[in-house]
């Protein structure tokens, strides 16, 4: 389908997305019950395989074309000193991605995934959201389109990640708008700020919510008013994957904030997504609880870039390898239990 050009079109397209293939899911469940193992012996791997099979429309699927997308954006609010690093680090890290020197490059290679980085108007940061909306509707839709169009329609698994100095503050503001509570509930150390830095981030989140009241009543306005271009691009990619029935592994706090916008806008929008890991950012667990998702890994990561999601590709690969590659009792000539 064509790329949406307005927030209304975007929400309408997401709401019209179809669910998983019930026949494939049922076939996968039936096959799982016939494999040479005691019932439930592979634990969560069995659930993952059945979930994946339903979304791919194949009771005996394979993972052959995983894709990792990293989006980069700069934030006007970074000028307020919310990060331990200056904004120019975003540009420098994009160059590092391009030369294969970042963690996500290594983890994507290890997982057998294609990986690409997409910088979005780095020379023009979003507006400081304590002074008004971070983006116009045209601006947020342009960023959503970057993510939407970056998805390879032949991919069979998607991980999205980000780079953007100041984006934990933006993600905290979005999460606070979506789920309420105090700003302190949603702010954390990000790139490593101290207690004074966390307090500053909380104050800035509060200011942003006060200046942009529409963010508290409309999830897509929360993305526009408080988010960044890389958050919008991740939302666009995850939404397009939903329409294409490409399963998604979510990364950490910032990725999950972008994804949560979709679920709050359209219930069920994240049924095709699982949580790859639980971030060391203290608010990530709270957001996953709201989304009803349990992370596959708990490794204390807080890097971003899609790193935890890329690591989790191997877990899902293992689930699918067992499901599709194991023999049934009949095939193996083994007596069933």
Curated annotation (Swiss-Prot):
It catalyses: 5,6-dimethylbenzimidazole + nicotinate beta-D-ribonucleotide = alpha-ribazole 5'-phosphate + nicotinate + H(+). Its EC number is 2.4.2.21. The keyword Transferase applies. The active site is at residue 305. One of its GO terms (molecular function) is nicotinate-nucleotide-dimethylbenzimidazole phosphoribosyltransferase activity. Pathway: Nucleoside biosynthesis; alpha-ribazole biosynthesis; alpha-ribazole from 5,6-dimethylbenzimidazole: step 1/2. NCBIfam families: cobT_DBIPRT (TIGR03160), PRK00105.1 (NF000996). Catalyzes the synthesis of alpha-ribazole-5'-phosphate from nicotinate mononucleotide (NAMN) and 5,6-dimethylbenzimidazole (DMB). This is Nicotinate-nucleotide--dimethylbenzimidazole phosphoribosyltransferase. It comes from Jannaschia sp. (strain CCS1). The gene is cobT.
């Amino acid at each position: 389908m064509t790329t949406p050009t307005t927030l209304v079109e975007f929400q309408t397209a997401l709401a019209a997305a179809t669910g998983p293939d019930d026949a494939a899911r049922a076939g996968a469940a039936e096959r799982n019950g016939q494999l040479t193992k005691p019932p439930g012996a592979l634990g969560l791997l069995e659930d993952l395989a059945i979930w994946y099979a339903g979304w791919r429309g194949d009771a005996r699927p394979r993972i052959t074309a995983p894709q990792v997308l990293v989006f980069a954006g700069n934030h006007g609010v970074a000028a307020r000193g919310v990060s331990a690093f200056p904004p120019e680090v975003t540009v420098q890290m994009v160059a590092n991605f391009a030369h294969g020197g970042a963690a996500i490059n290594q983890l994507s290679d290890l997982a057998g995934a294609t990986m690409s980085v997409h910088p979005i108007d780095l020379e023009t940061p979003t507006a400081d959201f304590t002074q008004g909306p971070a983006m116009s509707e045209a601006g947020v839709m342009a960023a959503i389109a970057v993510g939407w169009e970056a998805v390879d329609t032949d991919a069979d698994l998607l991980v999205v990640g980000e780079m953007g100095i100041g984006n934990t503050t933006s993600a905290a503001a979005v999460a606070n708008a979506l789920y309420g509570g105090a700003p302190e509930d949603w702010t954390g150390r990000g790139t490593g700020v101290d207690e004074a830095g966390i307090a500053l981030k909380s104050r800035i989140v509060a200011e942003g919510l006060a200046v942009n009241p529409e963010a508290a009543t409309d999830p897509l306005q929360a993305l526009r008013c408080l988010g960044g271009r890389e958050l919008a691009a991740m939302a666009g990619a995850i939404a397009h994957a939903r329409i294409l029935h490409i399963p998604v592994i979510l990364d950490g706090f910032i990725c999950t904030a972008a994804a949560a916008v979709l679920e709050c806008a359209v219930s069920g929008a994240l049924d095709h997504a699982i949580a790859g890991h639980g971030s060391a950012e203290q608010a990530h667990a709270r957001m996953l609880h709201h989304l009803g998702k349990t992370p596959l890994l708990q490794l204390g990561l807080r890097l971003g870039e899609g790193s935890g999601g890329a690591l989790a590709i191997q877990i899902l690969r293992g689930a699918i390898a067992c499901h599709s590659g194991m023999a049934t009792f009949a095939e193996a000539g083994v007596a069933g239990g």
